[in-house]
Amino acid sequence: MASVAYICSLPVNTSRDQVSLATVHRLVFMERSERQKIQLTTNQPYDESFEVNAEEAASVHTPSPRQIVSRRTGRQKQSTMSGYAGEKLEEDTKRKKEPPPGPRGANKNDEEEDEDDDDDDDDDDSDDTESDEEEEEPGSAPEGAYDPADYEHLPVTGEIKELFQYITRYTPQTIELDHKLKPFIPDFIPAVGDIDAFLKVPRPDGKPDNLGLLVLDEPCTKQSDPTVLSLWLSENSKQHNVTEVKVKSIENPEKNPKAIDNWIESISELHRSKPPATVHYTRPMPDIDSLMQEWPSEFEELLGKVNLPTADIDCDLAEYVDMICGILDIPVYKNRIHSLHVLFTLYSEFKNSQHFKSATDGQKSDTPPASRSATAEIERLTLD
């Protein structure tokens, strides 16, 4: 750089050989103090620079282009300039051994060629700096981004091309979501049927509550009655010889009728769930299904003409039982209790039969409603 500055300071009418010899003598015989004073200027993107007085300078600060140039480009230009100075020295030493130069016109052409080479080098350096700046730009498009030039050659209509323009017009918004940890109490889901692990929370007063030992620990809002539960267990286990039975007492039953209703409902449900009692007859009795079969047609025609005997007939109870059991084909022995049991079992089966329920409902819908007094007389049962 010092040699270049010195060459620029020489007069214009000096020849090329004179310039090269002057440059060599200047660099070789330069004093040490002058070499220390020489400083290499930093890389600048422009060839010329000038100083402006502080009064004439604008008040607004404008950053110089050298701030944009990266360190990488500065080092490259420094290496290229140092290499360029070394090449100049080698050319000057070679030209000392060559014969004297030709006419002045050739020297002018050589100078013009050298200037063109310098301009080309400056252009290359500026291109390198621009490419480096483009690489280091933080806002550059990432790899695989949308490029409109890739879709310009598509054979589509103008409306479709307008749709592609919306891609470049769209600017996504960065929305920062606030993530907050909020404490919450999960819903309590009772696990009915799990084994009691006896992990109980003790009472605040420290007294033992015997939860799970004397009282069942059931995860349910509707707690079961211990007395009803013991009755259910004894019924299922067929053990009816339990000596100790806990009986729950209700305080102020007048003010707590709901507890009484619950007790009645639970006991009635217990009785409904019981299987029917089995009776062992001492004499052979017919099957209930066979007794529920239809009568012969001749007997049905006779019943249409002659009604069945009612309780108003002039006879005692034993004779009336024998008469009804004979009509229903139920055998009667000396002990009429078994015969009566079969009779009432047959009546219960007819009452609970779905077939006869639907038949009776159809007859009720066909027949007109009777008066209140007539129904009251029909449902009345007289016992002497």
UniProtKB/Swiss-Prot annotation:
It is found in: Cytoplasm, Cytoskeleton, Cilium basal body; Cell projection, Cilium. Its main location: cytoplasm. Residues 87-99 have a biased composition (Basic and acidic residues). Residues 358-374 have a biased composition (Polar residues). Disruption phenotype: Individuals display a number of developmental defects, including dorsalization and formation of ectopic tail. One of its GO terms (biological process) is retina development in camera-type eye. Residues 52-151, 358-384 are annotated as: Disordered. The keyword Oxidoreductase does not apply. Forms part of a complex involved in intraflagellar transport (IFT), the bi-directional movement of particles required for the assembly, maintenance and functioning of primary cilia. Plays a role in early embryonic development. This is Intraflagellar transport protein 46 homolog. It comes from Danio rerio (Zebrafish). The gene is ift46.
